[in-house]
Amino acid sequence: MYKRQLATLGLSYKEGLDAAARGSAGDSMRAVLRRFYGPDCDTDAIMDALHAQAETAFQAPPPKKPGLDELIAYLEAQHIPMVVASSSRMASILRHLNNWHMTDHFQALISGEQFTSSKPDPEIFLTAAKALGTTPAETLVLEDSYNGVRAGARGGFVTVMVPDLAPADDEMRRLYTAECKDLREVKKMLEEGKLLSET
């Protein structure tokens, strides 16, 4: 996805950019872009181009993650509140949740647009925990991006990686609490009391 939009700005894709940028926004994304394209690159133009491409690519709702419905049903049955804390724009979050008829399941929706620093800064997750009325140590973070896992670990959260586009590497294995192949496995671990003691 990045190659086409970068080309419109006269830039070539640099290996590793997608993994480094995934899950970031705002100043965190700008820092990634400067690392790859130099301190004087037009970060706002690059980000605008990438956001425009993402908005076009994701007009149709992506498929739900396997096990999502079962996990939400389990959490609701256990009276465990949920928050969406995503680096995506709020318009994208709402579009996906509305298309899936899932908006009402969540106590709060938190977008990366609300913060100057995004993942790997844990601020977005700390804000989510505040909305839930929980401490990081009793709050489960589910993440598929490296930056998200970094943010969860830095904030002291129970961080579970559910890999999607990028597999867990040695750094992720040092940082996360657990790795699950899908959300069904997350549910199983919760049922077995392996993630949150309250469950």
Where are the predicted features?
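Asp-based, Mg2+/Mn2+-dependent phosphohydrolase catalytic module
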Residues: 73-76, 89-199
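N-terminal helical cap/lid subdomain that shapes the substrate entry/recognition surface
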Residues: 1-69, 73-78
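Residues at secondary-structure transition points
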Residues: 16-24, 41, 45, 59-66, ...
